[in-house]
Regions:
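Small-residue-centered hinge/linker elements
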Residues: 1-119, 127-215
Length: 215
């Protein structure tokens, strides 16, 4: 029953937000990566001493990548593990303000959220897109503002060709590789048709995984 009450409380908070009846200094505010109680704020150290039911707050603010913050798989998992292990944390609010990032990192984070046993509500800020949306799709509820940029399900890869610029600058590069396509992403020559097809197949495969995760 405890988690049901906590989830209802979270949903009510976001209903008030949607109606413009909750201030910017609402009870769910906290610093990046902290877990706080609904009706108060708490530091990460305070969480260990909670004595009543609470709602955890975790921020994903920035590029999804492997940097150790809550925008990374290892950082998010650490916070989710703390929330999972604390019996007083009945649900989690994931505050997302991210345009995406590394597909692999996003997929890992989505998996961690999918395995999390307690209710999760996503609060979207100005943007919740691409890899960030992949993560958010695993929550029980996603809330957005009318002006939130959300979704952007798709995959892109860039392979830069600097050979023309290097020629103008008089720069010559000799690539010594063990296979013909080993230097295809170095930017020192245009892609061959076979290499372009290889990278396109890779992008398509990643995108299929993205769609399956978000579905």
């Amino acid at each position: 029953r405890g988690w049901i009450v906590a989830l209802v409380a979270v949903v009510l908070v976001f209903a008030l937000l949607a109606l413009g009846m909750w201030s910017c200094t609402s009870a769910v505010s906290s610093s990046i990566g902290t877990l706080g109680a609904l009706g108060s704020t708490a530091t990460t150290s305070d969480v260990d001493y909670l004595t009543s039911d609470a709602v955890g707050v975790i921020d994903i603010d920035g590029t999804i990548q492997y940097d150790g913050t809550t925008c990374s798989p290892e950082g998010l998992k650490a916070q989710l593990d703390r929330a999972e292990q604390n019996p007083h944390i009945k649900a989690v609010v994931l505050r997302v303000n991210s345009g995406g990032g590394t597909a692999t990192a996003g997929e890992e984070m989505a998996e961690y959220l999918r395995e999390f046993s307690k209710p999760v509500v996503v609060s979207s800020a100005s943007i919740n897109a691409s890899a960030a949306y992949m993560i958010s799709s695993q929550a029980d509820y996603i809330f957005t503002a009318k002006t939130t940029s959300i979704g952007a399900i798709g995959t892109v890869m860039q392979v830069t060709d600097l050979s023309g610029l290097m020629e103008k600058l008089g720069i010559s590069v000799d690539n010594i590789a063990s296979a013909d396509s080993k230097d295809s992403s170095y930017g020192t020559r245009p892609l061959t048709e076979e290499e372009r097809a290889y990278y396109q197949a890779m992008v398509d495969q990643i995108n299929e995984s993205f769609i399956e995760t978000a579905a």
